[in-house]
Amino acid sequence: MKKNAFYAQSGGVTSVINATAASVILESKKYKSKIGKVYAGKNGILGALKEELIDTSKESKSSINSLKSTPGGAFGSCRFKLKSFEENKKEYIRLVEVFKAHNIGYFFYNGGNDSADTALKIYKACKALNFDLKCIAIPKTVDNDLAVTDC
């Protein structure tokens, strides 16, 4: 069954983070049988928690392509660190509610170490809540300090 994707930016934005966004959006279109719309989170994972999703399918291909040379974070960013599932189960339940409401089955989180940690926490929580979500951490760092990115 076709599922939608959720993409969000996190941490300090770099000069190329929007190029990654454009690539995720454009590449997703190549998998029409698996991926429907790509929603972008307004201000990172907070966009999912607040259900502030940007439907990128409403944008033209040229508009998405222009992201490749647009500095800053087009969708906004955050430095919001999720607590563990045990400490704040309610937050994870909220994420699953939003993902279900928008038929989201893919989560792309673009950021550094904390963002990769967030993607892992969300994956584990979704597994515990019996919700199938493919979580992909997309590395981005100004400091070139990504640790333990291979599992």
Walk through the language-model features, giving the residues of each.
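Solvent-exposed alpha-helices and their adjacent loops that cap or buttress functional pockets
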Residues: M1, F6, K30-S33, N65-S69, ...
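A short, small-residue-rich loop immediately preceding and capping a beta-strand
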Residues: N4-Q9, G105-D114
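N-terminal phosphate-binding or glycine-rich loops at protein starts, especially the Walker A/P-loop
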Residues: M1-E52
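Short Gly/Thr/Asp-enriched flexible loops that form oxyanion-binding sites at enzyme active sites
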Residues: T20-V24, N113-L133
